[in-house]
Every structure is written in structure tokens, then in C-alpha cells.
């Protein structure tokens, strides 16, 4: 959805067509400009800017130049809420550029303003896939039982590749609430989706059910886990996340027969059930080391990195530490899956990530690894939530605390 850092670097080095020398000079100046802005001292509080400056920044949110759009987002994020929110809401409704509307909607979520919910409800009906994805992601993090009927209606017709998984997660989030007729219908719909449709969408359903500890889907997930196929590892991991130890018999059985690429997910699931966790985590670490030294095991590598990521999200700090320890000195193709897993941990268990980085002796290199993972993630709303948390923590922390220095470093390295 967003350009990755490599694309951004390419954009930053593009100059005019007049000469290679001029192009290179302009590229260097752009890089220096972005690095200087990112590395500058963060303001101690939200700022007030002129209305013209704010409007100009919003208009540049979709600029092709990396430095321009990054600095525009940076200005909007640091503007006082009372000034920024009305202008962002206007942009979401009225901007002619669909990508600018999308970026404005994402930035709006960082201000924690109650009016954001109205903008999200309206965006659910937008023909713009990006806006609908952001809106469903918002309701995942802000579940509203009043939206269940609308979500279920959308479930029967929404087929956009990035939108449907966000819709499923929003429905799974509200289904995790207290039982009631609306929640019951949502749960029935999600269980039905486990065995219906394309594998890509079924995988998203299975993951969401695991993430939201959907005990009600235990039997459906167990049935999928027992079948050889592309969804076996997804279902096994979901059972581990749910935490019902009845799953142990199934997991132990498929551990003996499942193909090698599925083994990391099964080991992770058993660890999540608090059974032989140390040995299973060691297996994941050893698998990463093996895959690093022996090319050709990329699928196994991705599975092991994702397994450590899942353990870290569940609160296993040593798993996050292993991703950093192995990831920092590594090179691609080993490095990318570990940086992606670390970034996922940062989004889904931000307190654990912050605590680890705050006391890590190699913080700078760990944050570089994290930044690479952020560039690969497409969850722009979740990243914005992380950015907002980081800024608030910076503003609220006393000058002399290590946490404030960490926030400053994150803001600079992650270009926000």
C-alpha cells in the first residue's frame, strides 16, 4: 500500500533530466534534508502552525517525492489536535486525490478524537479500497457492537484483497466481547468462514480467530489443523494462541506427520500452551541459524521468524530478544523475515518492544532492523497507532529519562 523505503530512497535521488551530475546532487540534498529533519530535536509539545501551512502539508501527503510527503506527514502529526482534526476531516471528505484522502484518514487516527468514528463510518461506504481498509482496521481497535449487522452484510459481498481481511478482524474483535445475540451471530459467521472461500481469505479468518482467542471456533480450527494442506500451520498456530490445552493431542499428532515448513508453527503453538516451551523456542532459534547458513530454506526461515514473533506478541520477551540478536548481524535473505517479525511485535505488543529497546545495549542497530520491518508492513493504521504512542510518550516523559531518548531515536529512525 505505502511505498517501501527502497522506493523512497529512489524517489529522493531523482532530480531533473538535465544531467546525471545535477540529479545526483539533488538526490544527496534530498537525503540530507530528510535526515536532518528526522534527526532534529523533537518539539516538546504539539505545535500551532498557520492554516495555510497545514493545508499545504495535507495537499502534499500524496506527493511522489519521499522527502516531501514524509515532511508533510511529520508536520500534520505535530500540529495541535484542535487545529489538525477539523482540517483532516475536511480532507477525508473533500480532497480530490483519493490517496490524500486515505493518508488524511490514517493521520486522523493519531489524534484520538471522538469525531474520528464518524469519519470511519462514512468511509465504510467509500468505493476507495484504502479508505475501507482503514475504517475496518479502526473498528478492530475500537469495537462497536452496533456495527455487527453492517459488518455481516459486508462479509457477504466484500472481496477486495486487502479490505476483506480487515473486515474479518473487525468482526473477530467485536465477537470477542460479552455474549449477546449480535455477538452470537458474528461468531457463527466467522466459524462458517473458516471452511468457506479462497485459502487466502480463510487464512485471514483463522489468524484473526487465533489473535482474538476465539474459543468458540476451537472445533472448526481443530478440523483444519488435522488436514494436510496450506492452512494446517495457520490453524495449528491459532489453536496455540487460543490457549485451550485440549489442542495438545492434535498438535502432538500433526507434529509427527506435518511437512517441515509447518513444524515451526506447530512448535510455536505447543509453546503457547505452556508445554516444553523452552525446547520449542530453542528449536525456532536453531532453525533460523540453520536457514541462515544453508540457502534454499526460505519458507522454513519465514515460519521460524514468524513463530518467534508470535511468542513475543504473547509476552515472551526472550523471543523478541532472539529476533534482534539473530537479525542485527544477518543479511538478506535471512534478515528480512526477522525484521518483519520484529516490526509485527512492535505493533501488537508495543510495551514489550519498548521495554526491550530501552535497555538493549545495541539499541541503534536494533531500531534499524525494526525500521526495515516497518517498511515492509502494509498496516498503515497500526503503524500510525505506534507512531502516536511514541509521540505521546515522548511528550509526557521528563527530559532526563532514558525512555524519552528512546522515543527521540525511534522518531528519527522510523521517519515520522
Language-model features and meaning:
Residues 1-39, 44:
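Intrinsic disorder/low-complexity segments
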Residues 42-64:
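Short N-terminal segments immediately surrounding and downstream of signal-peptide cleavage
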Residues 8, 13-16, 40, 46, ...:
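Intrinsically disordered, low-complexity regions enriched in polar/acidic and amide residues
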